[in-house]
């Protein structure tokens, strides 16, 4: 209608819109709760102040947080110390985008998910080593370290299957332990209501290029609830021990660790509301050795690890005659090699991983050709796997 004049004149009007957008550089900055404040006294004196960025785990090559091309949240040691929490599970509740569903007190058992997924769709790492359990993700957060031993926590949002495998569909969480370079001894203890007691300690010995540290912790509580018969059904007991060592020079750095987590807890109605006297025992061990070269055109980062898990679930606590206990044992062995090099167009990384997951169980998997005896029992066997 508005173009009737042009129509009378025998003219044709063509109207078009050309939209042009140029993306020269897009980068998802890592969201960090680690806020560093400049020391104004140094600024006024004219002295330069350098703040080293933390290298986070998000690719096969080490990158600082600002170089990451995906969403990364870093909880620093300062954040961990300032948070009014007693477990890693409670600490993760403070991070947006992370869903924490906890069963029992003091982090007895927790399901953690990222970006609306579930606990089976993310990878859990300890010092960059995948400690995922093929049996279940329910016990993924049975760490061998106490919260007081954590240096920082890195939460990587988004698929990371190319680095950590298919389990990291929606992201990964990496727990990095402290690596003090000076000799020291620390102890801590606390108590609370419902018979709650926590204690722990760490000893660190540093000699030149070598560093060794050993830590342990104990935690227990009577729980806050009882079953219909009046017995405790949310009680909890946990023992943890962790050793790690380092060798560091200009050409090479090597780190190794070994840890265990022993946990017993009344799981109440965790798996079925029909039975209120469930119980679970888990025992996990972790070992790993890593290295990184620092000279040469190509930097290499090999690692080898072994994770062992034993799990016993009791539908009726201490009464196997009412319903047989479920036993599971997993052994995960792995070796990986990552490498990277810098050149004109930036940094290129490549790597490979070989991982073997072995599961034997009384009720999970396929029938075994040769059943295996369950250690510590009289006549129970693993018949599936």
Regions of interest found by a model, annotated:
Residues 50-81, 111:
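N-terminal periplasmic "start-of-domain" segments of outer-membrane beta-barrel proteins
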Residues 89, 93-129, 133, 151:
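Extracytoplasmic beta-strand/coil segments of soluble accessory domains associated
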Residues 92, 153-154, 173-175, 245:
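Non-catalytic regulatory/gating segments with a bias toward low-complexity or hydrophobic composition
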Residues 130-157:
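Short acidic/polar hinge/loop motifs at secondary-structure boundaries
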Residues 172, 177-205, 216, 231-234:
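Short strand-turn segments of transmembrane beta-barrel domains in outer membranes
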Residues 191-193, 207-209, 218-222, 249-251, ...:
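Transmembrane beta-strands of outer-membrane beta-barrel pores
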Residues 221-238, 252-300, 306-331, 376:
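Flexible loop and strand-edge segments within Gram-negative outer membrane beta-barrel domains
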Residues 306, 323-385:
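Outer-membrane beta-barrel transmembrane domain signature of Gram-negative proteins
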């Amino acid at each position: 209608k508005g173009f009737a004049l042009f129509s009378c004149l025998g003219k044709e009007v063509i109207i078009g819109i050309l939209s042009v957008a140029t993306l020269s550089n897009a980068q998802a900055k890592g969201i960090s709760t680690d806020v560093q404040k400049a020391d104004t006294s140094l600024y006024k004196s004219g002295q330069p102040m350098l703040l080293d960025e933390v290298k986070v785990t998000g690719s096969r090559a080490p990158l600082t947080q600002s170089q990451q091309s995906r969403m990364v949240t870093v909880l620093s040691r300062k954040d961990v110390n300032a948070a009014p929490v007693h477990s890693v599970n409670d600490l993760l509740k403070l991070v947006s985008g992370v869903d924490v569903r906890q069963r029992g007190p003091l982090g007895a058992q927790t399901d953690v998910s990222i970006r609306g997924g579930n606990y089976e769709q993310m990878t859990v790492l300890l010092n960059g080593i995948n400690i995922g359990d093929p049996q279940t993700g329910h016990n993924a957060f049975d760490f061998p370290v106490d919260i007081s031993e954590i240096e920082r926590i890195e939460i990587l949002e988004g698929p990371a299957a190319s680095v950590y495998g298919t389990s990291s569909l929606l992201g990964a969480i990496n727990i990095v332990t402290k690596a003090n370079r000076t000799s020291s001894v620390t102890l801590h203890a606390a108590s609370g209501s419902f018979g709650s007691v926590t204690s722990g300690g760490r000893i660190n010995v540093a000699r030149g290029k070598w560093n060794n540290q050993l830590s342990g912790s104990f935690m227990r509580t009577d729980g806050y609830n009882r079953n219909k018969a009046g017995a405790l059904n949310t009680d909890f007991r946990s023992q943890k021990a962790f050793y790690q060592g380092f060798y560091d020079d200009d050409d090479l750095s090597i780190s190794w660790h070994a840890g265990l987590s022993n946990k017993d807890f009344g799981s109440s109605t965790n798996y079925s509301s029909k039975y209120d006297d469930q119980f679970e025992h888990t025992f996990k061990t972790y070992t790993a050795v890593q290295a990184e070269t620092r000279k040469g055109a190509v930097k290499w980062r090999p690692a080898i690890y072994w994770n062992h898990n034993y799990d016993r679930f009791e539908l009726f606590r201490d009464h196997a005659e009412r319903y047989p206990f479920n036993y599971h044992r997993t052994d995960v062995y792995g070796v990986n090699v990552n490498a990277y090099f810098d050149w004109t167009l930036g940094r290129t990384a490549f790597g490979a991983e070989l991982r073997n997951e072995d599961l034997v169980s009384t009720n999970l998997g396929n029938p075994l050709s040769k059943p295996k005896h369950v250690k510590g029992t009289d006549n129970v066997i693993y018949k599936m796997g």
